[in-house]
């Protein structure tokens, strides 16, 4: 197998044993990008000069047996809404085209400390608003399994690059499913950690009470290794949680005999495709064969997740994106002749259609006379959804179900139908609304397109999610499939 498809864990061993140099790994990755990414279109910017320089410095440390860092010499790709000092960060928007940050996000500081090597920035839906990566101002990423299909979104570039062997791991952000859904569509592993597990400092805000950074990898253990590296409280993020336990790997191989798994009947109900239902039901049988106890439960407020999410997320986006006005931040219209025109034209020209749609929706929901009817009511529904999960977790360790109701749809199929696009978030948005951790792992294919299985856990219990996902992965994985892509 080419180095480009090696796991994080195997690469770490090869580097530690001096069977390969970090500079060789980085060269192989850039060769793969040059060969494959003109088709996949996952990267927006490459940091080749700095990456090669960093890898050569790591070569010298390797020669001296000074290989410090959990990710020593491991290449990484970063979603383009995560601030990278000195490297363009655009959120895939005309509004931020050419913006080069002068500070580092906390997750990037942590990854640099662990001696990972930044390869480049990855494509996404504009300002993380979308489920297909088609709202990007710059390019449309394709699904490595089927180039006619979308990779999902908003972290579509992050999922596609990992699936195509262009990086062993990437970071994405998840506000309503934006790590897990593309992970499902692209046949990789994607973790949305508990809200507060990972610092949001340096993540360009979409919806501050929902956003969370997480890793995408080709296997479960790699994912746990990366989350260990980026987790932890941060003085720069008041919503980050002071939780000391960031060990996700030591018990990952422990069996799941007796583990209680809840299967909500709503997760296999209306709107979920038959091929997805079949794959999930097969996965449930696999869990039972591994000794888990799987029982049907009800999460009755699941159906309100999408409307509640879109009101809350759009309202927060309306506020967060007000800073992009052409004066303090972002694109500056050259055609304006007055201050009022400057505000209007900069935002009208700088933002894409979907971003403007959500700003309008959020502004409306927060406006006088509608706040109580929409925003306040949505927050009440959010509490009901959280209460549903709390009740289930009194008796169960993990919730299981599909990640997305269908496999990846075709490029261009849903971009002009926002309500159909939003419906794809049916099974992921409740997890964000409740602030819970959720992981997507591959569980099947239909017509060559991957199907994702989602495990949802108790707050800050990513350890159990990794354990059950790892055990399931021993029975089903796509390791041999990636290289054929």
Swiss-Prot record:
Subunit organization:
Heterotrimer of A, B and C subunits.
Tell me one GO biological process term. translation
- Origin species, per record, is Staphylococcus aureus (strain JH9)
What molecular function terms (GO) are annotated for this protein? ATP binding; glutaminyl-tRNA synthase (glutamine-hydrolyzing) activity
The record's EC number reads 6.3.5.7
Q: Provide the alphabetized UniProt keywords.
A: ATP-binding, Ligase, Nucleotide-binding, Protein biosynthesis
Active site residues according to the UniProt entry = 79, 154, 178
Reaction equations catalysed = L-glutamyl-tRNA(Gln) + L-glutamine + ATP + H2O = L-glutaminyl-tRNA(Gln) + L-glutamate + ADP + phosphate + H(+)
By its UniProt entry, which InterPro entries does this protein fall under? Amidase, Amidase_CS, Amidase_dom, AS_sf, GatA
Q: Which GO terms describe its cellular component?
A: glutamyl-tRNA(Gln) amidotransferase complex
PANTHER family for the chain: GLUTAMYL-TRNA(GLN) AMIDOTRANSFERASE SUBUNIT A, TRANSAMIDASE
Q: Which Pfam families match?
A: Amidase (PF01425)
Q: What class of enzyme is it?
A: ligase
Explain the purpose of this protein.
Allows the formation of correctly charged Gln-tRNA(Gln) through the transamidation of misacylated Glu-tRNA(Gln) in organisms which lack glutaminyl-tRNA synthetase. The reaction takes place in the presence of glutamine and ATP through an activated gamma-phospho-Glu-tRNA(Gln).
Q: Kindly provide the name given to this protein in its UniProt entry.
A: Glutamyl-tRNA(Gln) amidotransferase subunit A
Q: Nucleotide-binding among the record's keywords?
A: yes
* The organism's place on the tree of life at top rank: Bacteria
The family note in this entry says: Belongs to the amidase family. GatA subfamily.
């Amino acid at each position: 197998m080419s180095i480009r498809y090696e796991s994080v864990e195997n690469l770490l061993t090869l580097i530690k044993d001096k069977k390969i140099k970090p500079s060789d790994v980085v060269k192989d990755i850039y060769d793969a990008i040059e060969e494959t990414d003109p088709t996949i279109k996952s990267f927006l910017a490459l940091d080749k000069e700095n990456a090669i320089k960093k890898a050569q410095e790591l070569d010298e440390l390797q020669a001296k047996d000074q290989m410090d860092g959990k990710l020593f010499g491991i290449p990484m790709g970063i979603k383009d809404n995560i601030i990278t000092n000195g490297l363009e960060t655009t959120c895939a928007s005309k509004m931020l085209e050419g913006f080069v940050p002068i500070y580092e996000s906390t997750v990037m500081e942590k990854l640099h400390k662990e001696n990972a090597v930044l390869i480049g920035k990855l494509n996404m839906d504009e300002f993380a608003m979308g489920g297909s990566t088609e709202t990007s101002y710059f390019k449309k990423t394709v699904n490595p399994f089927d180039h006619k299909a979308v990779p999902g979104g908003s972290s579509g570039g992050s999922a596609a690059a990992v699936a195509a062997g262009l990086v062993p791991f990437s970071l994405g952000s998840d506000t309503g499913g934006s790590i897990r859904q593309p992970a499902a569509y692209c046949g990789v592993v994607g973790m949305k950690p508990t809200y507060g597990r990972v610092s949001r400092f340096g993540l360009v805000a979409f919806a501050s009470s929902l956003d969370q950074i997480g890793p995408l990898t080709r296997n479960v253990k790699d994912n746990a290794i990366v989350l260990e590296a980026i987790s932890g409280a941060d003085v720069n993020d008041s919503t980050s949680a002071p939780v000391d336990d960031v060990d996700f790997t030591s018990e990952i191989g422990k069996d799941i005999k007796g583990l209680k798994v809840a299967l909500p009947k709503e997760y296999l109900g209306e709107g979920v495709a038959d091929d997805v239902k079949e794959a999930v039901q097969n996965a449930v049988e696999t869990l039972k064969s591994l000794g888990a106890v799987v029982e049907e439960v009800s999460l009755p407020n699941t159906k309100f997740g999408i409307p509640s999410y879109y009101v809350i997320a759009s309202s927060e986006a309306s506020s967060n994106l007000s800073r992009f006005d052409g004066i303090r931040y972002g694109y500056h219209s050259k055609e304006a002749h007055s201050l009022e025109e400057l505000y209007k034209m900069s935002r009208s020209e700088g933002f894409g259609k979907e971003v403007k749609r959500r700003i309008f929706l959020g502004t409306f929901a927060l406006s006088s006379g509608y706040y109580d009817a929409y925003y306040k009511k949505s927050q009440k529904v959010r509490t009901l959804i959280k209460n549903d999960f709390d009740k289930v977790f009194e008796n169960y360790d993990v919730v299981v179900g599909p990640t997305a109701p269908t496999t990846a749809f075709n490029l261009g199929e849903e971009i002009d139908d926002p309500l159909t696009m939003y419906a794809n978030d049916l099974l992921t948005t409740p997890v964000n609304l409740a602030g819970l951790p959720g992981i997507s792992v591959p569980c099947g294919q239909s017509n060559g397109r991957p199907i994702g299985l989602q495990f949802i856990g108790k707050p800050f219990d990513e350890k159990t999610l990794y354990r059950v996902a790892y055990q399931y992965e021993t029975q089903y994985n796509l390791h041999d499939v990636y290289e054929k892509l």
